[in-house]
Amino acid sequence: MEPQLTSTTVAGARIELIRCGKGRPILFLHPHIGLEQAQPFIKLLAADAEVLAPSHPGYGESERPKGVTSIDDIAYLYLEMLSDLDLHDVMLVGSSLGAWIALEMAVKSPERICRMVLVGPVGVKFSARDKLDIADLYAIPDKKFVELAYHDPKLAIRDYAAMSEEQLIVVARNSESTARYAWSPYMYDPRLRHLLYRLHVPTLILWGASDQFAPLANGQNYVEAIEGAKFMEIANAGHFPHIEQPEATAAAISAFIQSRSVAAKQKEVA
């Protein structure tokens, strides 16, 4: 089944939404670069599930409701969206900034979330206040970001001259929205670390083995901070495994789902 581009209205704002597949609901939350290059991964994820992949408020062609100025606000907006769509036992899959949104949603409404996969998450600060946990997007040139964030930098090459005006507007909106939501404090919520005790859903943390934007060692901090979290590296991938290794990333998520399903059935039998 091919992904279908549609939209939904939340808090009076039109939110661009990709839907694909049928089955248990999976909410895919994109990174700061948007839904660009995510469709192959979404199709794989939708093999036996219904995937909903919104463009965050202010990204893509999504409107930004008045008052939505933080990742915290986006989390509440998406929880409202799940309520409007009457979706329960939702699995969250978030990449980078999208993983931050997933964490904020899960600590606010853990009863609505059944599982969570965090791919190269940001949003929680583990180091000292004056030390960066991840590279500073606003202090390095684009070329350096590509070198840090991709195993194969060629995948990040954009031919701006060949882009339509609409595509260029999306690129600009994504960049502007990232600055709005994540510039200060840079890529984290100072309260979030102290709310992780509320997480009791099965959690898998995936990390690109070549990720230098958010160092691999940072993944262990999330594992230690989230009760029962599992950790797995994705080979030949940087900060966006869903783009560089969509098959391996989707397979890891599928195996995680199956392992939890088997464990649940064994518990029922016992």
PLM features per residue range, with description:
Residues 1-14:
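N-terminal cap/lid segment of alpha/beta-hydrolase-fold proteins
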Residues 11-61:
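Conserved HGGG/HGGXW glycine-rich cap/lid loop of the alpha/beta-hydrolase fold
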Residues 52-93, 251:
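Active-site loop/oxyanion-hole signature of alpha/beta-hydrolase fold enzymes
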Residues 100-103, 107-108, 114-144:
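Flexible "cap/lid" loop of the alpha/beta hydrolase fold
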Residues 183-224, 233:
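Conserved serine/cysteine hydrolase catalytic core
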